[in-house]
Amino acid sequence: MIVTAEPTGPPATDAAVIEESWAAPERFEAIFRRHFGQIHRYLAARVGGRTADDLAAEVFTIAFAQRQRYDLARECARPWLYGIATNLVSAYRRREQRRYRALARMAAHGVAPSDEDLVADRVSAAAARPALAAALAGLGRGDRDVPLLVAVAGLDNQEVALSLGIPYGTVCSRLSRARARLRDSLGGANPAGSYGPAGNIRPVRGQKEQPSG
């Protein structure tokens, strides 16, 4: 018997996998495997590890239920998934603000928070600084979502725009406002771009700020 080898080539795009999942729901597992880790890390940085476990599962439950409405013109599902995640975070907005303010108070009084109380992953080191924690807490919802999608999720400005369903120029203006607020909170230090790994600040790759539209 002659066995025909499976065709080899680059992995199917997210859009192709999602389209296949319309008729074969089990194919959606590939989207979960590709993106769950990043989505969970983003949520952990926004709402803490315990809540992130539940919310990350909910992101993919919602995505699966809505997969037949996915825009197949978008080959990568990352912005879509981060948009769902950010919408879920909004339900925890007050809790998030209390977390940042508590971190700021504890740091100001020299009290070290437990690991469970720390904001996870890349933003944790930055959030533990009282001035920066207070600045993040003071930002409005939209102004806080933008820099954290850049900081924690590693999205560029265009991907943030797709995630939040807002114009590219609005992303740039919100990011600019957030940087200005953080600059003031850091005593004039220049946060010239997004947060990088371990709370470092670096320019957004290939992006120039534009007026909001």
Regions found by a protein language model. Name each.
Residues 65-72, 83-105, 117, 125:
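Arg/Lys-rich amphipathic alpha helix in sigma70-family domain 2
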Residues 1-30, 34-38, 211-213:
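N-terminal module of bacterial RNA polymerase sigma factors
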Residues 54-61, 75-87:
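Structural recognition of an alpha-helix C-terminal capping motif at a helix-to-coil junction
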Residues 2-4, 8, 162-165, 179-213:
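C-terminal edge and immediately downstream basic/flexible tail or linker adjoining helix-turn-helix-like DNA-binding
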Residues 31-50, 65-66, 136, 188:
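Amphipathic, Lys/Arg- and hydrophobic-enriched alpha-helical face
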Residues 4, 22-30, 40-58, 72:
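Short, charged helix-capping/linker segments at alpha-helix termini
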Residues 134-145, 153-170, 181-184:
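Helix-turn-helix DNA-binding module
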Residues 11-14, 100-125, 129, 156, ...:
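Internal acidic/polar
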